[in-house]
Amino acid sequence: MLRSGLIGVDDYLKLLAQTMTGVQRGAGRLKQTLEDSSLDAWSKYYRQDENSPNSLVSYYTKGSLAALLLDLHIRQQSSGRKSLDDVMYGLWQQYLDSPRGVGETEWEQIAEQITGLPLQALFERLLRSTDELPLASTLASVGIELQLRPAESNADKGGKYLNDDLSRLAQRPVLGVRTASDAGAVKLTHVLDGGAGQAAGLAANDVLIALDGLRVTPANLDKMIETRSPGDTLLVHAFRRDELMTFNLTLKPAAADTVALRLADQADAAQLALRQGWLGQTDKQAKSE
């Protein structure tokens, strides 16, 4: 969309940051490789359950970030002479009239041939590892600053770069669950790994009734939590099927899982050249939007 002119650089960076945020918020990124996500798509990704955010990663979203990192790596290592575009065009030329598909690792070999770069170590990290993606360092090489911070609220999907003190966000208390409104009640759809809800013993499909003796609803849940602090312990009443249960839940601070991107003001000449080649605009054009 950026290349076609439908959106500008700021909007593109916002969308990209929101994709990164979505991946960062799933513990499954640390448990399932991108290759396994693709392999198990029909048995796991398209049959998701309440534990999926803890065990799976999307080969669509993480895959798009892997492609981004590959593209920027090629641009950097070739001093802007090659990019992922060259690889895709080379594949198109090679297989245009071929009745045969691309082999499992053949794509990687062709990418090395076309770019003239050793890429195997990068492919291993992007496709067959659960290591964190090197987003910040790679984007810095093309003059983009990445900010990783806690969310401002449950509605914060990322993309907004904050210039103020972020320490206040680190003191924002969270339950570590995802919820949905169910006939006016708060139903837990997911209990996230390492969160306060999981530590307290809550489970997906539990229906919250009260916090510290006060009725909880979809309308007041966030406000009830916002008045507390990390480390506070709440008495939680919830129904699990038809059984009323009680839990002692100790609130945890919000994790740094929200991404924002912006053009770096202090980018050097090499970074600016790579950034222009990637975004297709000069620094002056990008900042004037």
Model-inferred region functions:
Residues 6-289:
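C-terminal recognition in membrane/secretory proteostasis and scaffolding
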